[in-house]
Every structure is written in structure tokens, then in C-alpha cells.
């Protein structure tokens, strides 16, 4: 009985481990999506994020696919040194989240 329980538990773990809710997209995939018109240009997305925090500089960007949607994440540092995380819908260009990095 213990073997059966262990087998069921291991099988359940293997099945759920395969589900990933967010997938990082590499540069080649990101450029392909941009060129196909699936996502906004990176310049436009960066401009939208920077407009939210004038005077900031971009420190990092990342494109992910989350729950079937393309999300562009931008990390900013403002003039006071405060870091911000801005997430945009990469297809529509709308800001989804904007919060101070803690």
C-alpha cells in the first residue's frame, strides 16, 4: 500500500510540474513576434513605461508569455534611485502593473 501511495504521489507531482504559468521568451522569439505584428515594438513599450516615471532609466527588460498573454516587464530606476517594476500587455501596450521594487 505504501508503494502505491508513493507511486500516486510521484505521478501527481510529475503531472503538475509540467504546468508552467510563465515562460521567458528569448530574443529570437521576441523579434519574431514583433516582426509579425503580434506584439508592439519594444521602443513603444519602453516609451510607455518611461512615461509613467519621467526621468527614469531602463535597467532591464524581459518578455514572457503568461497564461497565453505576452507580458513585457520593464525595470526602471528613477532620478532618486528608486526602482520600479512596470508590466505591460505586449500586444496592446497597456500598463498592467506598476509598483515600487522592494
Predicted feature locations:
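Long, terminal "pre-/pro-" and other extracytoplasmic accessory regions
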Residues: 2-102
Amino acid at each position: 500500500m505504501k508503494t502505491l501511495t508513493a507511486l500516486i504521489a510521484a505521478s501527481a507531482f510529475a503531472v503538475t510540474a509540467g504546468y508552467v504559468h510563465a515562460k521567458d521568451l528569448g530574443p529570437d522569439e521576441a523579434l519574431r513576434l514583433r516582426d509579425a505584428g503580434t506584439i508592439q515594438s519594444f521602443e513603444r513599450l519602453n516609451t510607455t513605461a518611461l512615461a509613467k516615471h519621467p526621468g527614469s532609466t531602463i535597467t532591464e527588460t524581459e518578455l514572457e508569455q503568461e497564461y497565453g498573454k505576452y507580458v513585457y516587464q520593464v525595470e526602471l530606476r528613477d532620478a532618486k534611485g528608486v526602482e520600479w517594476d512596470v508590466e505591460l500587455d505586449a500586444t496592446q501596450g497597456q500598463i498592467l502593473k506598476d509598483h515600487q521594487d522592494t
